[in-house]
Amino acid sequence: MESAASHIIVRTPVIDSIGELYETRGLGKKSVVLFDENTRKLYGDKIIASMQRQGFRTVELVVPARETSKSVSTAWKLYGQMIETDVDRSWNLLCVGGGVVGDLGGYIAASYYRGIPVVQLPTTLLAMTDSSIGGKVAINHPLGKNLIGYFHMPALVLIDPAFLRTLPAREIFGGMAEVVKYGFIADRKFFDMLAEHWDEVTRLEEPWISDAVSRSAFTKADVVEKDFRETSGLRATLNFGHTFAHGLEKMAEYRNLRHGEAVTIGMACALYLSYRLGFLAEAELNEGLALIARFRFPRNLVNKRFISLDLEELFDAMHSDKKKIDKQLRFVLLDRIGHAFLHDREVPKADVLHAIDDAQRWFSEKR
């Protein structure tokens, strides 16, 4: 497999050189451009005009800006639009948006004509640092999130931190969950930088925000390159906090709780579980929680979507997670800040429930 990092370009403004960048990857200038309703309104005219000036032929597709767009019915509709406009395997697909557009577009690209190239142009912090990188693309099923999909590496990931300036604070803090995750699982120095310059990063100040985005993106790319299909357990460490998070998202019926918010809560649960099982020292537990305490949530969200939840119901919801094997939940844990591992033994249910309860109590005290 080619280096995942070699496909990542971090540049402002990135769209002005898209033709040149496509040429470096051997991509043609016939592009289906997939937006959601928000990204089409914010960036669509500028992106399409720039591409056409650079000699591109484009077909635009637009989907609603919500998680429910990641569905078989939406994909089927988009396939039809592509067929009707004579899109063949000589085309590529450019995804302009956050995780929903990136996942949906990647899924369509992986399956259309048995696979056409996909280029990711992420516009959210979460997509820039996580979902656009690594080639995992999927749609949802009523019984679980991201259950139907492919591994389909993007030909390019074009990251422009300037897009972040249009985002509300809730989106920034949601994206910071994945940024902080990389410090927890792989880079103690990065964790320390985030702790020291949290305000500058979350205010999108330079050079801090570009540094945080770049380090996150290239950390994920490095992990993906070493374990593309999750055979060694290394790539699974990218799911730190996610087993809990997917249960939270399912209980919220994939509404009113952003993925990054669920991951933030999930990381607190995972810290407590790492400590309860004897892997993480108390001092590092507290250090990790201190950084999580700096996240901001909408009023009453944590109480409604986590603190008030029944432990048993959340535990049951977690079993829809893709990381379980033979109905056994698998957890990514820390043995120190900066190093994670996939715990390949069954964790007693009582310990999982205690960790959730500890996190509920901690969040309750912090609110």
Swiss-Prot record:
Q: What is this protein called?
A: 3-dehydroquinate synthase
Chief location? cytoplasm
The text of the family note is: Belongs to the sugar phosphate cyclases superfamily. Dehydroquinate synthase family.
Under which EC number(s) is this enzyme classified? 4.2.3.4
HAMAP family in alphabetical order: DHQ_synthase
Q: According to its UniProt record, where is this protein located? A: Cytoplasm
To which pathway does this protein belong?
Metabolic intermediate biosynthesis; chorismate biosynthesis; chorismate from D-erythrose 4-phosphate and phosphoenolpyruvate: step 2/7
* Entry binding sites for NAD(+): 99-103, 123-124, 136, 145, 163-166
Q: Which SUPFAM superfamilies match?
A: Dehydroquinate synthase-like (SSF56796)
**Residues binding Zn(2+), per UniProt:** 178, 242, 259
| Reactions catalysed, as given in the entry | 7-phospho-2-dehydro-3-deoxy-D-arabino-heptonate = 3-dehydroquinate + phosphate
**Which EC class is the enzyme in?**
lyase
Protein's job: Catalyzes the conversion of 3-deoxy-D-arabino-heptulosonate 7-phosphate (DAHP) to dehydroquinate (DHQ).
Cofactor remark: Binds 1 divalent metal cation per subunit. Can use either Co(2+) or Zn(2+).
Record lineage: Bacteria, Pseudomonadati, Chlorobiota, Chlorobiia, Chlorobiales
A single GO cellular-component term from the record reads: cytoplasm
Q: Which cofactors does this protein require?
A: Co(2+); Zn(2+); NAD(+)
Which gene name belongs to this protein? Answer: aroB
Q: What are the UniProt keywords, alphabetically? A: Amino-acid biosynthesis, Aromatic amino acid biosynthesis, Cobalt, Cytoplasm, Lyase, Metal-binding, NAD, Nucleotide-binding, Zinc
